Amino acid sequence: KEVVTPQRDSLVNRPEKHPESYYGAGAAQIQLSRGDKLHEAGFRGQGMTIAVIDAGYHNADRITAFDMNRVLGVKDFVNPRADIFAEQSHGMAVWSCMGLNRPEVMVGTAPEASYWLLRSEDDYSENLVEQDYWSAAVEFADSVGVDVINTSLGYYTFDDPSKNYEFRQLDGRYALMSRQASHVADKGMVLVCSAGNAGAGPWKKITPPADADNVLTVGAVGKDGVLDTFLSIGNTA
């Protein structure tokens, strides 16, 4: 797992405007994925419930571009007593791509959806138990009627090297979270997960749960539509 941490407080303290575009800082990405065309057709996430399963959501409750009224609830599966808004910011960055809604600053792909913000990633260690946390978060999402799960997590190395995965284990059945992910569609939900950020390192391959059956594994491209060098290699949607 590798997480790219943005400048944590930039949207809180310095919300930069981009008057040349309604979508602000998100203009290039939403146009590349044709999300703007969906918006023009009236599809802005309304009536959908999305669960984000990730690391923390640092300062998301202070960023006014987020509509906290659209947050149905939060739950921390790593430390139930922790404040997910005081933890790592990767989940906040992921959510922002969908949920931000401030014209000329940034408008995400689903600004009118409802959200559950769930934390399963322990930023201070890398252990197999985090896949148990993730699996519990998936079951919780099912219990509260979620339509779509978005998760940008993946695992292949651990603090105990004897637990590290091997290429032959990328079969959608070996890793616990891959087995769990394969059942999500059976419950009527869509799971969208990142391919991984290991493309430039020695591993290179996609990371579980991206190898699961019946999920949408999404890669990464730059503004020019060319695959990014960090993108993990393997099957996507």
What positions do the PLM features span?
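Autoinhibitory propeptides
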Residues: 1-29, 36-39, 213
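Subtilisin-like serine protease catalytic core
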Residues: 36-75, 80-130, 144-147, 160, ...
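Active-site glycine-centered loops adjacent to acidic/histidine catalytic or metal-binding residues
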Residues: 54, 181, 196
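Short acidic, glycine-rich surface-loop motifs adjacent to enzyme active sites
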Residues: 115, 139-171, 194-195
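Active-site-adjacent substrate-recognition loops and nearby beta-strands
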Residues: 131-134, 158-159, 164-166, 178, ...
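Catalytic-core regions built around general acid/base machinery
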Residues: 172-188
